[in-house]
Amino acid sequence: MSSRRWVLAGLLALGAATSAGAEERRVPAKKVFPYLDAYLRIPPAQRSRFTPAYVFIKTRPTALWLVEGAARTPLPVDAEGRVLRLPNAEQIERGEILVSGPDKARYSVRLEMHPLVAPAAEMDAASLSAAVSQASAAAKSLAGPLSFAAPKFSGVLFPGGAQGEVIYANGRRAALPLDKGVARFNPADHPGARVVHFAKAPQDLLID
């Protein structure tokens, strides 16, 4: 599987111990969610087809909170390490993140891009293509002067999808290729595609 996901937040070294075997530390929200502020500044019409996801890799925190003054808001993290609720623009600018986890834990955060298309047995090919195009343009915008190094997205991966195929406007069908065992749809390779079809809905969609 090609790697067009960014490991952006680097390592967060946790500090003050709070109980045996556990530590927590406050860090600026921007350190945990880099580029989220820039994403939120993109006009909504230019980010209507995709959404960013921040995923803790290797080590997952036991708890994560957004801290604004005396207020704490929990930020759920799923079993895969993905943060399920992201701060808004004001919270990113002013808030802090309280990270709680194992003693002396260090974390890395990966930024992924996901289409705003619900996983289903049949999905509109044009919507998937639009998500890839928007995410590619946004990656260049987020990278700024380093746009030459920004990921060049070309398709969508379907983890958990089985027997994927493209159905064209003329009714023709073609099997989706596998990228290290995961079905992949590259819009540029399938002009005239109408829908992407699976025997069962994939678990997730990932722009890559």
Predicted regions, residues:
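N-terminal Sec/ER secretory leader and immediately downstream segment
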Residues: A22-R94
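Short acidic/polar inter-strand loop motif in beta-rich domains
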Residues: G101-A118, A201-L206
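Glycine-rich, aromatic-bearing surface loops/beta-hairpins
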Residues: A139-D208
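Sec-dependent signal peptide hydrophobic core
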Residues: L11-L12
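Extracellular ectodomain segments of secreted/surface proteins
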Residues: E23-F56, A121-F158
